[in-house]
Amino acid sequence: MSEINKAEIVASNARAPSDTGSPEVQVALLTARINHLMPHFKTHMKDHHGRRGLLRMVSRRRKLLDYLKSRDADRYTSLIQKLGLRK
């Protein structure tokens, strides 16, 4: 994932112009990294060390989403819809 791509993700999910640490931005960046890694794991199914890192990212995203849901349900639902995480 390139720096330009990261900057676009931050800009599209930031609550303020200089916002880089809000849960929305963190979840969006983790989602982009997870989506970027998925083709690798479809090809290299036995990469268990890499899969452990992927599962850590998924777990961290889940914790951030739980935090956001407990703090502000409206922001949570809008983020879920924007990123397409729930069907």
UniProtKB/Swiss-Prot annotation:
Q: Which PROSITE patterns match?
A: RIBOSOMAL_S15 (PS00362)
| Presence of the UniProt keyword Ribonucleoprotein in the record | yes
Annotated GO MF terms: rRNA binding; structural constituent of ribosome
Q: What does this protein do?
A: One of the primary rRNA binding proteins, it binds directly to 16S rRNA where it helps nucleate assembly of the platform of the 30S subunit by binding and bridging several RNA helices of the 16S rRNA.
Asked whether the keyword RNA-binding is assigned, the reply is yes
Q: Which Pfam families match?
A: Ribosomal_S15
Q: Which ranges form a coiled coil? A: none
Q: What is the designated name of this protein? A: Small ribosomal subunit protein uS15
- Could you tell me the superkingdom of the organism this chain comes from? Bacteria
Annotated source species: Leptothrix cholodnii (strain ATCC 51168 / LMG 8142 / SP-6) (Leptothrix discophora (strain SP-6))
Key words, A-Z:
Ribonucleoprotein, Ribosomal protein, RNA-binding, rRNA-binding
A single GO cellular-component term from the record reads: cytosolic small ribosomal subunit
Q: Which GO terms describe its biological process?
A: translation
Instruction: Describe its partners and assembly state.
Output: Part of the 30S ribosomal subunit. Forms a bridge to the 50S subunit in the 70S ribosome, contacting the 23S rRNA.
Family, per entry: Belongs to the universal ribosomal protein uS15 family.
Instruction: Return the annotated region ranges for Disordered.
Output: 1-22
